[in-house]
Amino acid sequence: MKAFALFFVLSLYLLPNPTHSKFNPIRLRPAHETASSETPVLDINGDEVRAGENYYMVSAIWGAGGGGLRLVRLDSSSNECASDVIVSRSDFDNGDPITITPADPEATVVMPSTYQTFRFNIATNKLCVNNVNWGIKHDSESGQYFVKAGEFVSDNSNQFKIEVVNDNLNAYKISYCQFGTEKCFNVGRYYDPLTRATRLALSNIPFVFVIKPTDM
């Protein structure tokens, strides 16, 4: 069973990864509560992911999907705050710590298929200290909807959900849901030929990841 599960996750990475094509989204079906959704999101140790704590979000596929997520500034000519979310090229790079905060203020653990806010917990200058919350911005040149970091208001930054891909492997994906609607889309990888970076963007093919504690 585990071998089949690993094959399933790996097959997601063997599908074409678009570069020049514009994003033509396939809307996901709304997630309904099931028995499995009563299980909290788990890290690679099988421990519950705690609300408001820091974790690494790392590609579930060793050698094929890269490493963890990082906040960078791809435009070196710009003096603006780092706002680009990329997948590290190295399998050994866990990326930057990410704080996962449920929209429900009373939640103590992170539950799948519920709204979350993601923010990078990294050292930055005073001008950029609040420019770490995830959101979605459209890029007219590429036609992509990129995951960006910035001063997003709560209504725009807590529209993400962690969805279960495989229970046996504690593998997950992220979906983005438009505010006030049930329209949800996969967050996947997009290889940017201009910057030669793999960026997070809305995609028909999800970025499948595992969650690592930052104290490992």
From Swiss-Prot:
GO CC entries: vacuole
Tissue spec. comment: Accumulates specifically in tuberous roots and tubers upon tuberization. Sporamin accounts 60 to 80% of the total soluble protein of the organ.
Molecular function GO labels: endopeptidase inhibitor activity; nutrient reservoir activity
Transmembrane intervals: none
InterPro entries: Kunitz_inhibitor_STI-like_sf, Prot_inh_Kunz-lg
Signal sequence interval, chain numbering: 1-21
Domain of life: Eukaryota
SUPFAM superfamilies, per database record: STI-like
Alphabetically ordered keywords of this record: Signal, Storage protein, Vacuole
Localisation: Vacuole
PANTHER family, sorted: CYSTEINE PROTEASE INHIBITOR 8-LIKE (PTHR33107:SF28), KUNITZ TRYPSIN INHIBITOR 2 (PTHR33107)
Record's function text: Major tuberous root protein.
Family: Belongs to the protease inhibitor I3 (leguminous Kunitz-type inhibitor) family.
Name of the protein: Sporamin B
Organism: Ipomoea batatas
